[in-house]
Amino acid sequence: MVDQRPRAGSRSFTAPSLIGTNGHFASVGDAAHDPKAYEHGVQVIDEEKEFNPNLSKYLSLEDVTNAGFNYHLISVFGSQSTGKSTLLNHLFGTQFSVMSDKERRQTTKGIWMSKNKTKHEDPNARMADNILVMDVEGTDGRERGEDQDFERKSALFALATSEVLIVNIWEHQVGLYQGANMGLLKTVFEVNLQLFLKDKNTTHRSLLFFVIRDFMGNTPLKNLETTLLEDLSRIWASLSKPQGLERSTIHDYFDFAFYGLPHKGYKPDEFAAEAKKLGSRFREGRRDRKEQLMGASIENGVFLPEYHRRIPADGFAHYANGIWDQIVNNKDLDLPTQQELLAQFRCDEISREVIAAFDEAIAPFEEKQAAGVRAGELVILGGLGAAMRGARVKAVKNFETEASRYHKGVYQRKRAELEGKIDTRLKALFQGQLNAAHKSGVKDFSDAVSNAVKAGQKKGASYDFAEIVKQETKAALERYEKEARASLVEGTSWSNYKQELKLYQKDLAEVSGQLRRDEMRRLATRVERWVRSRLSDSVSLEFNSLGSGRGGSGAPETGEKPSESKIWDRIWNLFVETVLDAERRFTDRATSFDASVDEVDVGLWRLRRKSWGVLRLKVEEEMMEGNLLLKLRENFEDKFRYDEAGVPRIWRPTDDIEGIYTRARESTLTLIPLLSKFHLAENNAPPPLDRWVGHTPSSATAADEEDLTPIGGVDEEDGKSLEEEVTILNDAKRQDLTVRFKKAADGVYVEAKRSAIGGITQVPLYFYGLLLALGWNEIWAVLRNPAYFFLLFVCAIGAYVTYQLNLWGPILKMADAASRQALEELKKKLREFLEASDTGRQAMAMSSGEEYEMSSLNRGGKRVEDEDENDDI
């Protein structure tokens, strides 16, 4: 399309009036949320100096956000209404609004941005990717008048953000001060020095690209270039420079490029061709150090690496906002600080995004582990290691990809913080996993050993406990290491389980030691049961054969009958032999448990003490009052009722019953002091119990001693002597036992006397006939009544059994003794009653001092004692 040069004062808007400010571009407001509002660009800063918060939205829609450093920023300067927007539209295919031919007034307000839209088919003429073009409000406009505040602020903003500053001037303005924008360029130089003062470590180079419009060619471009450079150098020399920069030149901070464009209205075709040629220069370029030192102008690609501000595209909007905030508030612009602030902002933002993705992968594992802890369950998380490794690598890689383009110091610090946060959570999961594997492994190990032992016991075969422990320990360690290796996260200092493995091995050793001790306790219990069974039979036989005076029951079938005086010797020898056999069994079995010498010593020491306790209890059981009295009576009856050949005696009145009774009774009475103390006959002293038990092993613990019964003469702290330990019956019990035995012996004696007398007297025969005649009705009633008959039958059976056991005498004797005891108690209660009442006390006071004992009389009025004496006779 061919345009004629518009006449002065006749330009106006060419865009539709319905599209907001400047005709085409989205400004701040609700329309910014509509993607179609960004089709032609975005107003970065409006005429009221407000920054557009939707700049990042525009960059995202233009696919610039993910470009990293692969983008370029160009700003255009120039006087108002000099065709800056028209130039940009032809160079980059943008649609900045331009003035119409009908009126002349300000069109660009504030600062606008648009992405390059030009497409070149020729690869050699192809522009760089992602070129962002900023159209800056023109200077020297009548709308702002003498207010140059925005002019200075916009220049500072453009210089802080742009790589290339296009200065749009007309050829006839070269050599002028205001017309050639020298005032604006002086502002640019001043703000550049201001930036340098804040960052002396970095030289912010920029390219000033002078596009000379309406270039006729009469004056060579080289001459125009020389004129402009002289004017610029003079302006630079006039600036007040900071200390140390007095001799600096303009070429230390700026590069220059020049290009002339024909008149757009008079030579439209040439203008279009030259504009296309000029556009091809906006690509990446290179130049050597020599050209830079010579200050040669840029002839080829204008985007040199040193021009780039090194702000990643995804952080540019925030960076630009921070820059403008500093500028608009008249604060000293500190680009390094702004870059660091941007880096902190973007790194924090990227870190949050990365952590959010990290949470999706790790949070479910954390919740499962926490739920297991709350429930008290051991939860081993499957696939945890792979999830942790993948989540960490992905998080760090994503952060590195997005954040490494920013300030290195901030990036490295934020990366360390991110890794610290991630590693803190992963370490907690890792430790929790190892802890669960630890506890679960110990429990499984204990259960496996116990089950293997039980299986061996059920089979009844001998099992090797040490081999079981060895195999299960190996399996437990393999399971733990497998789980630990699967949970490792490479590249982290905390991902190491050597210390945890040592603790696990230590706990397995402790558990195996406890299991071995428990097994040895069970072994000791089994051996103790065996000892108890053997001693129970052996000791019972000794006491059953105690003092047998006949060759029948109670006497050995072969050999000589045992001596009563050596009963304790025989019991001690049996006890020592039994325990010695038990010790051999215990030692052999404990060796298969891989028990240490100390553990075996403690086990044998406990076995001896426990065995003595078993013997002591068995002896006390046999020596219980009822059992001992019965054994003494049997001993007495064996000697009294049977002769030396073991033949039962048939008592006759002519037999020396009194002599036999006295000898048998005295012989039996000698057993009471013999049985009262566990003394050996050879030295009439207690057995060497203290020497036999031995001293307490040094390796014995309090737990080994807590269930042991103190032994007198062995345990000094018990305060009990060996003599007291072997005393079975004290003096009181001996006396009581003697009295009771004599009464029992007397009953046997009386029965024998009655038996001798009863053998002579006979019941008359007529008595049986009389009994039958008088009791016929009663006999018939009993026979006809089943209840009476059954009762009679039971009584007959009971009487027969009593007769066969020869218990009628003892029963009658016990009944007589019980009746006498009851009578004595009745007298005692009656006396207490009388003493308690007033009448009784008076009666007792009136009675004489003499007392008379009440005697038992028979039906004939004779005393019972007299009748007994007559019977003896």
Curated annotation (Swiss-Prot):
State the EC number(s): 3.6.5.-
Q: Which InterPro entries match?
A: G_GB1_RHD3_dom, P-loop_NTPase, RHD3/Sey1, Sey1/RHD3-like_3HB
What residue spans carry the Acidic residues bias annotation?
703-716
Keywords linked to the UniProt accession: Coiled coil, Endoplasmic reticulum, GTP-binding, Hydrolase, Membrane, Nucleotide-binding, Transmembrane, Transmembrane helix
- Give its localization: Endoplasmic reticulum membrane
Keyword field contains Membrane: yes
Parts of the chain on the Cytoplasmic side: 1-762, 808-873
Membrane topology term reads: Multi-pass membrane protein
Listed SUPFAM superfamilies = P-loop containing nucleoside triphosphate hydrolases
GO BP terms in the entry: endoplasmic reticulum membrane fusion
Q: Which residues cross the membrane?
A: 763-783, 787-807
Q: Which residue intervals define the domain GB1/RHD3-type G in the entry?
A: 68-320
> A Gene Ontology CC term for this entry?
endoplasmic reticulum membrane
Q: What Pfam families does the database record attribute to this sequence?
A: RHD3_GTPase, Sey1_3HB
Task: State the CDD domains in the record.
Answer: GBP (cd01851)
Q: Which residues lie on this side of the membrane: Lumenal?
A: 784-786
Locate the residues binding GTP: G78, S79, Q80, S81, T82, G83, K84, S85
Location of the region described as Disordered in the Swiss-Prot/TrEMBL record: 691-716, 839-873
PANTHER family in the cross-refs: PROTEIN SEY1
* Family, as annotated: Belongs to the TRAFAC class dynamin-like GTPase superfamily. GB1/RHD3 GTPase family. RHD3 subfamily.
Query: What job does this protein perform?
Result: Cooperates with the reticulon proteins and tubule-shaping DP1 family proteins to generate and maintain the structure of the tubular endoplasmic reticulum network. Has GTPase activity, which is required for its function in ER organization.
Q: Give the protein name, as stated in the record.
A: Protein sey1
